[in-house]
Amino acid sequence: MSAQGQALQNHNNELVKCIEDLREKREEIIKQLREDDAEKAKITQELQILTKRLAQVNESIARKTETKNEYDKVISETEAAYLKILESSQTLLTVLKREAVNIAKKKQASS
């Protein structure tokens, strides 16, 4: 019986040791979970800050794009009007030269 008692005692000691090892491993996992949760909270906060900043940058881009488009429109309209002025001044110059020639011819004809 004493051999059986000794075996039972050895099994009991080994069982207690295994349970203690499992508890230590569990505590290590709990520690890692806390660290991961803290990192997750930090990342979540950073993500919220970055998301807000991204929204602000997108709004800025939209406003500046709208302003750029307005500049493009004004420049295009101004260039078109300027081209019309150039064409008109060229036409006016051509008419003026022709009239000057006609006046000179009339003057010579009457002399």
UniProtKB/Swiss-Prot annotation:
Q: Does the keyword rRNA processing apply?
A: no
**Phenotype caused by lack of the gene:** RNAi-mediated knockdown results in multinucleate, multiflagellate cells.
Q: Where is it chiefly localized?
A: cytoplasm
Q: Which residues form a coiled coil?
A: 6-71
Query: Which cell locations does it reside in?
Result: Cytoplasm, Cytoskeleton, Flagellum basal body; Cytoplasm, Cytoskeleton, Flagellum axoneme
Q: What is the effect of changing E20A?
A: Drastic reduction in microtubule branching
Q: Name one GO biological process term.
A: cell division
- Outline what the protein does: Microtubule-binding protein which stabilizes dynamic microtubules by slowing growth and shrinkage at both plus and minus ends and serves as a sensor of microtubule damage. Induces microtubule branching which is mediated by the formation of long SSNA1 fibrils which guide microtubule protofilaments to split apart from the mother microtubule and form daughter microtubules. Required for cell division.
One Gene Ontology cellular component annotation held by this UniProt entry = motile cilium
Which UniProt keywords are given for this protein, alphabetically ordered? Cell cycle, Cell division, Cell projection, Cilium, Coiled coil, Cytoplasm, Cytoskeleton, Flagellum
What is its quaternary makeup? Answer: Self-assembles into fibrils in a head-to-tail fashion.
What InterPro entries does the record tag this protein with?
SSNA1_fam
Q: What is this protein called?
A: Microtubule nucleation factor SSNA1
State the family named in the UniProt similarity comment for this chain.
Belongs to the SSNA1 family.
Organism source for this protein? Chlamydomonas reinhardtii (Chlamydomonas smithii)
